[in-house]
């Protein structure tokens, strides 16, 4: 199937089931499993307010998977448009949302033809022998996959790092600004998949002696995923329309810029490890700032990030309380789990002060692989993960 057919084929381009399952960022705490329950809550809120369109807000979008559902549900079936305000502090999240929350109906025939042409050209570009100055290949991949050196970072294969550099050069130097996100977002998704990690970038797999990087580590896990070739992909979109406002800001500052909403969703960071350590390389790829200073450290993460208060043992509770008190919404939806910094009982109390509280357990037999320092201090290692959704009715 060629690019034009992809854009016009309802099975692949305007299919909500595919839209909510494919081209999703590999992300810690990804809420894909929550979608059915959140969809039911959206219906409940619409019924409670006796309206078919909603104004929805989301303060911590992350991978953007729940954002996709909200965009598709804000409006009604008669094309009366709802509004969706979506925010995250990370640049890669803004790029993902700018792409995937675009309605296919908002792309003109000219837009589609231009995108098809760009995808054709970028596929040709990555096959050319002329290479841009290495950036990802220089700092986060070995020079040779067959001769990895102890001093080399091994986040990507040498081939994929070269492809990433080529695609980033093309996107940032040749593609018009209005189209950049449609090529960059699918690339970010692929970079989150085809890398030499367990799903987050705080560390990469090494050999048995931990002396140098090794694809799949000593057990050679997930080699097909890790070494799978990165290729340009058309973004999957749907025809659902809404008035979408994408932001990249601190969530408290963002709240000052939006009006009261019908439904606000918060999925804050849970543990002490900041997301900007776990996913720093996605922001590196998103920003493509080749002039930034890369430190001679294990990860090569630039020292330009700040720790979120939600990842602080001392500040998380007060920060969350301030957030809830400041939120202007008829309903607030929150997701959190029993391994988080804020104890469930204290979170209950904060939300109960805001309005009538409905607590919805989410059954999950998994164990939390990302316990973090906070959980270790509480000696909760290997306890069963309990996840919850809270719906707060804030109406007087």
Predicted regions and their residues:
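Glycine-rich S-adenosyl-L-methionine
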Residues: 284-323
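SAM cofactor-binding core of SAM-dependent methyltransferases
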Residues: 54-125, 133-141, 149-153, 161, ...
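A polyampholytic, Gly/Pro-enriched intrinsically disordered region
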Residues: 105-117, 267, 376-391
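Class I S-adenosyl-L-methionine
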Residues: 344-348, 354-396
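Conserved Class I SAM-dependent methyltransferase catalytic core
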Residues: 307-354
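S-adenosyl-L-methionine
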Residues: 1-9, 13-59, 65-69
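SAM-dependent nucleic-acid methyltransferase catalytic core
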Residues: 9, 15, 34-40, 141-278, ...
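Conserved proline-anchored active-site loop of SAM-dependent methyltransferases
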Residues: 56-70, 86-91, 251, 257-278, ...
């Amino acid at each position: 199937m060629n690019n034009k057919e992809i854009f016009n084929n309802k099975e692949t381009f305007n299919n909500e089931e595919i839209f909510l399952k494919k081209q999703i960022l590999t992300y810690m705490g990804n809420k894909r499993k929550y979608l059915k329950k959140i969809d039911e809550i959206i219906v409940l809120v619409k019924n409670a307010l006796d309206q078919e369109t909603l104004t929805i807000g989301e303060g911590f979008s992350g991978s953007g998977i729940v954002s996709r559902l909200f965009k598709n549900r804000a409006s009604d079936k008669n094309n009366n448009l709802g509004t969706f305000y979506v925010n995250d502090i990370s640049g890669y999240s803004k790029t993902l949302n700018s792409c995937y929350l675009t309605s296919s109906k908002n792309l003109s025939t000219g837009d589609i033809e231009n995108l098809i042409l760009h995808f054709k050209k970028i596929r040709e570009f990555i096959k050319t022998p002329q290479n841009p100055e290495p950036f990802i290949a220089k700092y986060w991949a070995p020079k040779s996959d067959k001769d990895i050196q102890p001093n080399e970072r091994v986040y990507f294969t040498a081939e994929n790092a070269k492809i990433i550099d080529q695609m980033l050069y093309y996107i940032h130097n040749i593609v018009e600004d209005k189209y950049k996100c449609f090529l960059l977002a699918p690339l970010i998704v692929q970079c989150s998949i085809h890398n030499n990690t367990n799903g987050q970038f705080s560390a990469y797999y090494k050999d048995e002696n931990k002396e140098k990087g090794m694809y799949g580590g000593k057990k050679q896990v997930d080699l097909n995923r890790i070494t799978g070739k990165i290729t340009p992909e058309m973004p999957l979109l749907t025809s659902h329309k809404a008035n979408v406002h994408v932001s990249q800001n601190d969530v408290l500052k963002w709240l000052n810029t939006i009006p009261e909403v019908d439904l606000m969703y918060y999925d804050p960071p849970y543990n002490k490890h900041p997301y900007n350590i776990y996913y720093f390389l996605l922001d590196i790829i998103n920003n493509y700032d080749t002039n930034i200073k890369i430190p001679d450290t294990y990860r090569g993460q630039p020292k330009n990030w700040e720790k979120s208060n939600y990842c602080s043992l001392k500040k998380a509770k007060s920060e969350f309380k301030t957030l809830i008190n400041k939120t202007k919404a008829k309903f607030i939806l929150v997701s959190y789990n029993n391994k988080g910094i804020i104890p469930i009982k204290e979170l209950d109390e904060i939300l109960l002060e805001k309005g009538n509280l409905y607590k919805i357990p989410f059954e999950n037999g998994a164990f939390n692989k990302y316990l973090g320092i906070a959980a270790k201090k509480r000696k909760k290692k290997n306890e069963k993960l309990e996840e919850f959704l809270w719906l707060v009715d804030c109406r007087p």
